[in-house]
Amino acid sequence: MSQPKVSKSSIFAIIAGVIVVLLVCMAGSLFEDADKSKNYVCQMPVTGEYVVWTDGGLKWQGGGNKYEYFKTSQIEFVDLTEVSEGNYVASGTNPAASLTFNDKGKGFIIGSFRVVMPNDDANMKKIQQDFGSEKALIANLIKPTLYKVVTSCGPLMSSLESVSETRTDLIAYITDQLNNGVYKTVVIRDSVTNEITGEKEMRAKAQIVADTNSPSGYKRQETSPFSQYGITCGLVSILDIKYDGATQSQIDAQKQANLAVITSKTKSLEAIQRTVQITEEGRAAAERAKWEQEKEKAVAVTK
């Protein structure tokens, strides 16, 4: 029994059908409708070359693997667990940033900052080659750099200063070091008055080394790793600083001591003002008495 012959048209139809099926299956990797809020790096098949897309619209993907990076994103460091009263541990996927102050107080900064990606091909290709994905970039570069920078800020202030006058400085320090590199510092020892005991004590404090040739006028231990990839950071926000139990107690005691000093000075000033007032009132009374005496003498003479 002879096999039925397959016509050329049938063969072409089968081939065309297979091609159509393949095209349908590959349609998602042939073209990409790029989102303008993202940068894309596409690794082309066979050659392995990178193609970067930084503007939106339909792009030829050619079956390559694409990797997406938001042009700007917010990085949070907010996760903190209180394991016991006044005892905190950084936890979760976005751990809070720890630091130790120059008075040996300890705390965790809870906050966020914004990362802006480069828009040029060279930097995006380098980022893709070195990290391979946005997730890896955040985990292996952005967050470790943040934690290193925050740690370097601790010795620049006391725990009490971080509560009050230098908290805005802390934001500036973090922003500057993220973009320009960690400060070069020297340790100086100053004789200071303990706010609680009133006694003199030696306290070590880190002082930033000035350098007019460096960014912001400060010498750097190293350049920021972000500068190697054209990444910039800004909008640093400190939502809260959680201090461990011992540090919080020390801060509260210092506040009470400062308040007591202010109260004492206020009372002393009030006493001085009262003394001045009494003196002035006495003078006024003496003047009135003298006037009355002169008045009586004048009346007696005219009689």
Walk through the language-model features, giving the residues of each.
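Generic structural hydrophobic/aromatic packing signal, biased to beta-strands
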Residues: 34, 41, 67-75, 113, ...
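N-terminal Lys/Arg-rich, disordered targeting/topogenic segments
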Residues: 1-10
